[in-house]
Swiss-Prot record:
Keywords: Cytoplasm, Gluconeogenesis, Glycolysis, Isomerase. Its main location: cytoplasm. GO terms for molecular function: carbohydrate derivative binding; glucose-6-phosphate isomerase activity; monosaccharide binding. The gene is pgi. It is an enzyme of class 5 (isomerase). Its EC number is 5.3.1.9. It comes from the Bacteria. This is Glucose-6-phosphate isomerase. Catalyzes the reversible isomerization of glucose-6-phosphate to fructose-6-phosphate. InterPro entries: G6P_Isomerase (IPR001672), G6P_Isomerase_C (IPR023096), Phosphoglucose_isomerase_CS (IPR018189), SIS_dom_sf (IPR046348), SIS_PGI_1 (IPR035476), SIS_PGI_2 (IPR035482). It comes from Burkholderia lata (strain ATCC 17760 / DSM 23089 / LMG 22485 / NCIMB 9086 / R18194 / 383). It holds the Pfam family PGI. Coiled coil: none annotated.
Length: 540
């Protein structure tokens, strides 16, 4: 049965027509806000996070029908299949067991294998952090360079930045991902080879960007005096292809394993997170895993009506497929979460930016929305104008941390006030009559410019403090949200075939950039002209 033919989908279409013009302002009006209040009814805790869904354009009937849609689409069955280690990535014939990486049950899939690899990580991380692992001249490691791209970069970078307040001050962690040499060059300006450890992270150990940077970094070490037989003091590899790591020149003892049943964008919990463990320590890394496990248990055990990943995913579908929203915004009011929007861009769009259903037919409805964002309050001075007064509705996830992780506590009330005020302003808006009063006498022409449509939907996620545990729960919340949406849309969130064609053609174009001549029939006229211009520039 296709999505459009599910009874709950049909019922939601009728329900949407009934409430599409309803005003949140009216739903919050005192005469309508009974006990329990709307905020109390639509605020749900889970995994150390409280989610306030009350400023969304939903009522009790909306949630009831959305939850029925989840049941009709088989969300519970697919969730259970994923946790059990069944093949939920059919195009690649794989399980998706990122949840096993943080499971505490000894009966969980691959528990012994995971525990052994984590113990190896912990031993190494402690040696680096304590200074017993040294560089080739005997100096302690003070810089770690993580070289990877996509899931081998975005997750670790986001977490290390977020947990700076619990990281060791003895070691600075750098992240290099782009094949643009400027990325690596700028990091190399800051580090001393005698005190630098490189972590090369690639599932296949053949990724173009990662291996290009890794080779350049190896050459840099040698050029600055590191003997080739001492490179083992400065290079470790993380991969599902250990043989290729050794072939590159990294000692077998310096190889940490990841597995093909963990997708790259879900892999920070594995050895891909080695840079995280070195930064914050094995004990805090365990707390990160524990927080994710808290959310895993909530996702498995909470009824769908009170299940944060389920509701977050379903409300996203409500706006994407019924209101026609093209994008949604993630606005963490926390500078520590600066890289969370970038991380979620990959998690959501690489997972659910698909057009083919699981059976190979093509969807006739939208799937992943464009995910974007910026920390508050920066975004208020950049794009919030459009959110408040533009004609396009952009649903927003606000994320607020109630207690600061830094010593400048006097800043924090201002930060929280802005977050909460933005959600209220987006919901309330300002009518033309109200705008006339604000404009004042004799300024009637200004009033339309001072109106705000309001009725703009937002969800606010609250955590008491940003700790490894609450961060782990927050990340897992969005991981499971992705699965919920993929299940309803009947797509595979665990593959990424969309990245392949460009990579294949990229190799052809790269060869043409250094060729003596180009066959004009090989490319379209635009691509040929671009190559010719670049060839001329590269020869200068």
């Amino acid at each position: 049965m296709t999505l459009n033919s599910l009874p709950a989908w049909t019922a939601l279409q009728s329900h949407f027509e009934q409430i599409r013009h309803a005003r949140l302002r009216d739903w919050f009006a005192p005469e309508n806000d009974h006990t329990p209040t709307r905020a109390e009814r639509f605020t749900i805790p889970g995994g150390g996070i409280a989610a306030d869904f009350s400023k969304n354009r939903i009522n009790d009937d909306t949630l009831r029908l959305l939850v029925q849609l989840a049941r009709d689409a088989g969300v519970e069955a697919r969730r259970d299949a994923m946790f059990a280690g069944e093949i939920v990535n059919p195009t690649e014939g794989r399980a998706a067991l990122h949840t096993a990486l943080r499971a505490t049950d000894p009966q969980a899939p691959f528990h012994a294998q995971i525990s052994a690899e984590r113990a190896k990580m912990a031993t190494f991380a402690r040696a680096v952090r304590s200074g017993t692992w040294t560089g080739y001249t005997g100096k302690r490691i003070r810089h770690v360079i993580n070289i990877g791209i996509g899931g081998s970069d975005l997750g670790p970078k986001m977490v290390v930045h977020a947990l700076h307040h619990v990281a060791t001050p003895e070691i600075t962690t750098h992240f290099v991902s782009n094949v643009d040499g400027a990325d690596l060059a700028r990091v190399l300006e800051q580090v001393d080879p005698e005190e630098t450890l490189a972590i090369i992270v690639s599932k296949t150990f053949t990724t173009l960007e990662t291996m290009t940077n890794a080779r350049s970094l190896r050459d840099w070490f040698v050029a600055r005096g590191c003997p080739e037989d001492a490179l083992a003091k400065h290079f470790v590899g993380v991969s599902a292809n250990p043989a290729e790591v050794v072939k590159f020149g990294i000692a077998a003892d310096n190889v940490f394993e990841m597995w093909d049943w963990v997708g790259g964008r879900y892999s920070l919990w594995s050895a891909v997170g080695l840079s995280i463990m070195i930064a914050i320590g094995p004990e805090q890394f365990d707390e990160l895993l524990a927080g994710a496990n808290d959310m895993d248990r909530h996702f498995r055990e909470a009824p769908l009506e009170r299940n944060l990943p389920v509701l977050l995913g379903l409300i996203g579908i409500w706006y994407r497929n019924f209101f026609g929203s093209q994008s949604y915004l993630v606005a963490p009011y926390s500078e520590a979460l600066h890289y969370l929007p970038s991380y979620l861009q990959q998690l959501e769009m690489e997972s659910n930016g698909k057009s083919a259903r699981l059976d190979g037919t093509f969807v006739d409805y939208p799937t992943s929305a464009v995910t974007w964002g910026e920390p508050g309050t920066n975004g208020q001075h950049a794009f919030f104008q459009m959110l408040h007064q533009g004609p396009t509705i952009v649903p927003i996830d606000f994320i607020a941390v109630l207690t600061p992780e830094h010593p400048l506590a006097s800043h924090h009330p201002k930060l929280l006030a802005n977050c909460f005020a933005q959600s209220e302003a987006l919901m309330l808006g300002r009518t033309l009559d109200e705008a006339r009063k604000v404009a004042g006498p004799g300024k009637e022409a200004l009033a339309p410019h001072l109106t705000f449509p309001g009725n703009r939907p937002t969800t606010t996620l609250l955590v008491d403090a940003l700790t490894p545990r609450t961060l782990g729960a927050l990340i897992a919340l969005y991981e499971h949200k992705v699965l919920v949406q993929a299940t309803v849309w009947d797509i595979n969130p665990f593959d990424q075939w969309g990245v392949e064609l460009g990579k294949i053609l990229g190799k052809v174009v790269e060869a043409d950039l250094s060729a003596e001549s180009i066959d004009p029939a090989k490319h379209d006229s635009s691509t040929t002209a671009l190559i010719e211009r670049a060839r001329a520039a590269l020869k200068r």
